[in-house]
Amino acid sequence: MSRRLVWLGAMLTLVGWSATEATAQASQPIYLQYDGFVKNKDGTYTLSFGYFNLNHVDVRVQPGPDNAFLPAPGDRNQPILFLKGRHRFACSIVVPGDFGGQLQWIVRVAGKTFSTTAKILDPLYELELNSEKRATSGLDLAKAPKGVCVNRAPSIQVINPQADVNAGADTLAATSFATRLDQEVSLNGSVEDDGLPRESSLAISWKQLSGPGTVTFSEPSRPVTRARFSVAGVYELELSATDTEHTNAVKIKVTVNAPDEKK
């Protein structure tokens, strides 16, 4: 049985970014990482790349000698805005089944050169199921252009505020929960995006879809916000995100009980 690369790590939350935000020159490394590959049912491969920006600011590196893939073409629609922190699955590339296995991403910042492994199709890098889903999420293999980073819809999740963090990742996603009318509820959304299209901005929005009263969000344009409900009842809320080309959204149901009612 061949071994596969297994990733363990904490969940990352991305607060909405804008391409117009100020960026600075890198003084710390931006480590590139090869997340691994998926062998698709149609015989093609999906290759996934990410990065870890150790700077305390977002860093912009334009395509060219300092941000390129080898072999050519160097510009494969890879990210040019490197958000601070670690970001897996930032670039997913679909390649034909006869792909030779030679592809490296190279970035030069802070006077140093950083690159991904050359062993693209090493069996150790074949992704496990959960990572496979993230690497291929939003990909239409029949329409995806080959050999370039494909823009995918933002990935969205809302964390259940009443979840047991020790019960496993599958229990963290919220579909419904209850609160009391006299309480302000925390809505902990998570939005991840690949930074494509280039020079675009990611727009995030909370809104009320239904309910007997009105919902007031403290910060409706951020994934993490707080909400107050005007009257008791059942409400449906939606967190959406768009990168100007693709939009994704998740819905949750919140049951608001009167203070003297049990949850």
Segments predicted by a language model, with ranges:
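Short tyrosine-centred short linear motifs in exposed loops/low-complexity segments
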Residues: G43, G97-L103, V231-Y235
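C-terminal edge beta-strand
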Residues: N248-A258
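Extracellular acidic, Ser/Thr/Pro-rich low-complexity tracts
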Residues: Y51-N55, S190-P197, S210, D243
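Short, solvent-exposed loop/linker segments at the N-terminal edge
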Residues: K39-K41, A173-V185
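Residue-level recognition of secondary-structure-to-loop junctions
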Residues: K39, G97, A227-V231, T244
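Low-complexity "stalk/linker" and mucin-like segments enriched in Ser/Thr/Pro/Ala/Gly
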Residues: P79, A173-A174, L196-E199, K207-P223
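Proline/serine/threonine-rich low-complexity linkers at boundaries of modular beta-sandwich domains
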Residues: Q25-Q28, P145-N166
